């Protein structure tokens, strides 16, 4: 059997680097044929290209000559002579890389800029291993319409867990989806105690090692709100049948409750290589993708309800999803701008979600959902967020 041909989008990020680890561990199963990254770490991208011998490499920023020079340097350092991949540069590099013939496209890009590559991957006919939740959230019905049944395989640990649990019953037997949340670094704090937390504190996630945006979103629970929308879209479960429970140990990644009262949970130590491997190999599991739980050691798992007063982002995300159309895109764009303002020291931590709520309340909506209407709504939300924050800082 030939290895599956893999395209990695966002290869230098957390998901991308771990995906290469997965491929390295199962070279008989997977082969990387193309890579792309934003361009913030061209040296790493060059090393990855040489390591995987990808046929094509893309970068949103940086020129082809500079990248080829770095690839040549990396090739000499590792004794790989004459390696000359196709190099694609420019803002649409990841979209063009996603169009390359492959069996699986892993979209590990962060943010709504992943929408065009997601649509391109679906159009190509490849299976889409989706870690870029924002593209599904802002694209909504557009993305679902572009995908054939089963073409999108979730890579987020929570949604991968749900997909695994759903194998235990039919669609008609599903009662509720239960997403788990670690609670982030501020679990147990009141809203008043959250006012003056620092960016450094927000980035100190107790479980996962992620980038600035995702880590901050985990601290505010905006990330969990986005995941609720994602679960709603992926699994066609109404929003009022999707719950969030806090589970600090991050071992149970999500659960499915069935109509007979049974609950099926997926549990494993927190390691993104497991859902990445499953996304690449779906529906088959990859042997030894991650280390299992050690049942020779005493352990305890705890669960507690979400404090929606201290962390209103989940309910706010549900409201945006219920309004539909371009409201989820506005939610996401306003959050991204507010997070950057927080890290620039311009607003307080609690202002992030307050700003999202204010911008959502002013959004005029859209008569239909198209790529253009999504982009217009995002641009409006970013501009309106900047305007509000500029006024508040005066």
Swiss-Prot record:
Mn(2+) binds at residues 156, 158, 227. Its EC number is 1.1.1.267. One of its GO terms (biological process) is isopentenyl diphosphate biosynthetic process, methylerythritol 4-phosphate pathway involved in terpenoid biosynthetic process. Pathway: Isoprenoid biosynthesis; isopentenyl diphosphate biosynthesis via DXP pathway; isopentenyl diphosphate from 1-deoxy-D-xylulose 5-phosphate: step 1/6. NADPH binds at residues 12-15, 38, 41, 132, 134, 211. 1-deoxy-D-xylulose 5-phosphate binds at residues 133, 157-158, 182, 205, 218, 223-224, 227. SUPFAM superfamilies: 1-deoxy-D-xylulose-5-phosphate reductoisomerase, C-terminal domain, Glyceraldehyde-3-phosphate dehydrogenase-like, C-terminal domain, NAD(P)-binding Rossmann-fold domains. GO terms for molecular function: 1-deoxy-D-xylulose-5-phosphate reductoisomerase activity; manganese ion binding; NADPH binding. Keywords: Isoprene biosynthesis, Manganese, Metal-binding, NADP, Oxidoreductase. Catalyzes the NADPH-dependent rearrangement and reduction of 1-deoxy-D-xylulose-5-phosphate (DXP) to 2-C-methyl-D-erythritol 4-phosphate (MEP). This is 1-deoxy-D-xylulose 5-phosphate reductoisomerase. It comes from Arthrobacter sp. (strain FB24).
């Amino acid at each position: 059997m030939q290895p599956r041909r893999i395209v990695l989008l966002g290869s230098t990020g957390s998901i991308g680097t771990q995906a290469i680890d997965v491929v390295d561990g199962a070279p008989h199963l997977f082969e990387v044929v193309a890579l792309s990254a934003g361009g913030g770490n061209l040296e790493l991208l060059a090393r990855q290209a040489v390591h995987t011998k990808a046929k094509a490499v893309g970068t949103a920023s940086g020129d082809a000559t500079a990248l080829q020079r770095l690839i040549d340097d990396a090739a000499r350092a590792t004794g790989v002579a004459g390696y000359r991949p196709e190099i694609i540069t420019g803002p649409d590099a990841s979209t063009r890389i996603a169009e390359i013939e492959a069996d699986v496209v892993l979209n590990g890009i962060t943010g709504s800029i992943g929408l065009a590559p997601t649509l391109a991957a679906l159009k190509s006919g490849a299976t889409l291993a989706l870690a870029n939740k924002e593209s599904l959230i802002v694209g909504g019905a557009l993305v679902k319409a572009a995908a054939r049944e089963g073409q999108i395989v979730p890579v987020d640990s929570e949604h991968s867990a749900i997909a695994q649990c759903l194998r235990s019953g039919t669609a008609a037997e599903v009662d509720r989806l239960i997403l788990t949340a670690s609670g982030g670094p501020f679990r147990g704090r009141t809203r008043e105690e959250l006012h003056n937390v620092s960016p450094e504190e927000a980035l100190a996630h107790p479980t996962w090692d992620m980038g600035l945006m995702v880590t901050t979103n985990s601290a505010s629970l905006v990330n969990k709100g986005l995941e609720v929308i994602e679960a709603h879209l992926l699994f066609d479960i109404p929003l009022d049948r999707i719950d969030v429970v806090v589970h600090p140990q991050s071992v149970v990644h999500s659960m499915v409750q069935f109509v007979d009262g049974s609950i099926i949970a997926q549990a494993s130590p927190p390691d993104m290589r497991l859902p990445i491997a499953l996304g690449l190999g779906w529906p088959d599991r990859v042997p030894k993708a991650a280390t299992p739980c050690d049942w020779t050691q005493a352990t305890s798992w705890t669960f507690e309800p979400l404090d929606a007063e201290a962390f209103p982002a989940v309910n706010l995300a549900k409201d945006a999803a219920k309004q539909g159309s371009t409201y989820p895109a506005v939610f996401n764009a306003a959050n991204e701008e507010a997070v950057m303002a927080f890290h620039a020291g311009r607003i307080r931590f609690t202002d992030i979600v307050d700003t999202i709520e204010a911008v959502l309340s002013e959004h005029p909506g859209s008569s239909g959902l198209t790529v253009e209407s999504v982009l217009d709504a995002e641009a409006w939300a970013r501009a309106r967020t900047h305007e509000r924050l500029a006024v508040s800082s005066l």
